Amino acid sequence: GYVNFSSSAEARSEMDWLLGIELTRYASIKAHQFIRIGRCVCPIVAHIVEREKAIKDFVPKPYSAVSSKEETNGETIELTSKRTFEEGHEAEAQALADAFNKAGATVTSVKTERKTVNPGKLFSMSDLQSFACKADKTLSPADVLAATQTLYEGGYVTYPRTNSSYLATNEVVKVDAAIKGLAQNGITGLINKPKSKSIYDDSKIEAHSAITPTGKWPGTLSDAQKTVYECILNRFCAVFCEEDCTVDRTTIVIHCYDEDFTLKGDVQVTPGWRKFEKPSSGDKMLPKLNKGDAININFQLVGKMTTPPKRYTVESLNNWMVAPMRGAEKEDAEYSDEEWKEILSDATICTEATRADTVDRCVKSQYISLKKGVYYGEPAGFQLVEIMDKLGIVLDVPVTVNLSKQL
């Protein structure tokens, strides 16, 4: 076993020397300027530059939507048809709006179910970086890693460089101690859940378990450390909250002409873990409606423009690096590292320990920039991609993922 680890480390070192140092020298000589080439740097920069090109080349096109926004029983109900109309088809859009208004709208179904809402999983480093950078857009992934490392060295949180969202079954005692330590500092309402497979699962841990507070209460912290610690603490409290979070989940179906419109909303019954960590989006309030109720409508044409692709955020770039082969349409999906790992095993850009530092190198090399949590392609990044293309250097996602799997 140890021989294989040693051989893997040696191969990785030699591969990084070949791709990093030798190709950097080669590209720099050919380009007559310093060009940083890296096994993971290049696909990251290329990915962001490709998105930047798509945004710059995007030509917005006008189209029409058909929407109604009227008040019923004291609440505004907004209905928008699934159908849209390209420029020049306004007459068809108006005909649909007229048909909707003539037909009237009626509630055909109201279903309410009491649901238990589960909190998010404990944090891996990538999940923590995504969450913390969304909470404080001045932070970069490297800032989050550095803050977590300092908290770890101070004994306030567990080891940071982990790709797991689970705890080992032999860590039950450690969690008991953390809960006890937090209770001494006024945080109550927590209970250990040793039989929960969504928390304790040895099969989900490769080397290190999820990041958790130790129970040791920190003193003076920097702003970054405070933000990161609160993220870790609140998620831990949410996961081990004794009270369930329950909601009445209502689904209302409204029929108008030839289309069904579905409204969904939650009404909180017991806050549970939401006392510690607010949900990512606010509850949508729905009016009190019964089957057969008439809905006030006034469908009209709404002129809109198609929008360009979104730039990568810290979260969406992290999601992409964890599973870069899964397809762009899934980049914003809220899956944990563990869930992506099951979908596409080992197909990653960088490791959990190196991901933040690699992106930080891209920023310091001025290939990309990070502004308020959003990544931008910079002129040097465009130049890097162009030079690699001219020199026939192929370090795209499939090549990089294949190298990572072999190493």
Spans of model-derived segments:
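Toprim catalytic domain recognition across nucleic-acid enzymes
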Residues: G1-E339, I343-Y367, K372-Y375, P379-E386
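Short, exposed interaction patches on small structured surface elements
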Residues: D389-K390
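Non-catalytic DNA-recognition/assembly elements of restriction-modification systems
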Residues: D396-L407
